[in-house]
Amino acid sequence: SQMLKDEASLSRAKMSKIDLANVVDSVVEDFNSDLLNSNKNIKINVNNSNLNGSKLNVLGVESKLEQIIANLLDNAISFSPSNSKILVICNIKKKNAQLIIEDEGPGFNEKNIDKVFNRFYSNRPEKFGEHSGLGLNIVKNIIELHGGSITASNPRGNKKGARIEVLLPIYK
């Protein structure tokens, strides 16, 4: 499959210093303009305020980082009810760039939450239609090739939705 070939090409691709917050902004901008033309009325909000204007540099392949963000946003959108918001937060956590994506959808099934990154595992209720389940597995592989990690959780408290956290080493 194309995505698996992409994965192999990443290990050979040239990595460079990239401002992750910039990549997030441009991907979200594209998604928001597409969402304006959809009838679900979903808005993606980015919160970079914790960065205080400093760059969120990581060592990576820009097209792959875009692919990760797009894939995670795609998932969030497909699980989101109409008239809801998706929150994207960029932050610094210890020595990592932190990217959090939270939606207001049904959230993860708690007992299968550690399986969501497995290949071919799909957490989708039937009404979301067919899905290969490859998405999160490939996202995880690309993130790990960048020296990072990804975790899934349900936001604490009685908030609905799913929360994905990506950590990538900060590149000085």
Residue ranges and their predicted role:
Residues 8-13, 53-60:
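Conserved micro-motifs of the catalytic ATP-binding
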Residues 108-120:
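Short conserved segment of the HATPase_c
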